[in-house]
């Protein structure tokens, strides 16, 4: 998300302007729609490849200078077009889900190479009872079940990570379900979307479905120094992770987002 807003559209647009280019085009699966005189991100035709979740931080000025040629196509259509134009190797290239600068998605080795080596600490339950020892908190993610290296008689998931106390909390699958998600550093594209109806859909991670929700803004007296909102989901969402993006949609358009806290 930050790479897109700071590098691909920050530095790339600067370079485009130096070369006298009017637009930049990328291979993201997303579309741009104009509504009420403003430009919005819009879901791609290929819902399985839609990448609007990663692009929500793009500004309207960014969108005015961007073209998404693949947004109206499905992935099979793109592969067929590549094949018809002589790009047989590219048309059959395997897809990658890895972070571009981390080979084989081995972020643990990458962190170690950057000098980030956390010490072993305790696995605990929701009441703070010590269950065993983990290998370092940065090696775990919320919702993780495999690779914990501990047997407790029933499957357990990582439900909380506390870097300050170097503890990793383990719990049951349902412990990760919630109807309420809070986010900070929010950006709302047009407040009229909320005044007309606070009913939206939202995603808490890439590949998760957009779930119907209602936005609840804090009272002015409650507003913190970092803009904050709450979403109340109609159905419980699983594995909400602090630091990930919460992306808000209305009628297929990205109307805002924030960082889950």
Which positions does each model-derived feature cover?
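Nucleotide-activated chemistry modules centered on ATP-dependent adenylation/adenylyltransferase
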Residues: 1-217, 228-254, 259-261
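Cationic, low-complexity basic patches in intrinsically disordered or flexible, solvent-exposed regions
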Residues: 220-224
């Amino acid at each position: 998300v930050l790479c897109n807003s700071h590098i691909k559209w920050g530095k790339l647009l600067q370079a485009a302007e130096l070369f006298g280019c009017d637009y930049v085009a990328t291979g993201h699966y997303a579309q741009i729609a104009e509504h009420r005189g403003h430009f919005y991100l819009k879901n791609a035709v290929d819902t399985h490849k839609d990448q609007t979740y990663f692009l929500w931080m793009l500004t309207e000025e960014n969108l005015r200078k961007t073209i998404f040629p693949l947004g109206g196509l499905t992935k099979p259509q793109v592969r067929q077009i590549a094949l018809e134009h002589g790009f047989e190797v590219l048309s059959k290239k395997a897809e990658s889900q890895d972070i571009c600068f981390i080979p084989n998605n081995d972020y643990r080795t990458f962190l170690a190479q950057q000098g980030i080596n956390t010490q072993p600490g305790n696995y605990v339950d929701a009441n703070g009872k010590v269950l065993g020892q983990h290998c370092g908190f940065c090696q775990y993610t919320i919702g993780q079940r495999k690779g914990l290296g501990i047997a407790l008689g029933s499957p357990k998931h990582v439900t909380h990570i506390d870097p300050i106390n170097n503890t990793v909390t383990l719990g049951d699958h349902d412990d990760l379900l919630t109807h309420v998600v809070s986010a900070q550093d929010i950006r709302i594209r047009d407040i009229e979307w909320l005044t007309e109806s606070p009913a939206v859909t939202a995603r808490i991670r890439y590949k998760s479905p957009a779930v119907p929700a209602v936005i609840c803004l804090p009272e002015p007296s409650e507003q913190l120094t970092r803009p904050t909102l709450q979403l109340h989901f109609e159905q419980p969402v699983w594995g909400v992770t602090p630091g990930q993006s919460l992306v808000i949609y209305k009628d297929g358009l990205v109307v805002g987002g924030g960082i889950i806290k």
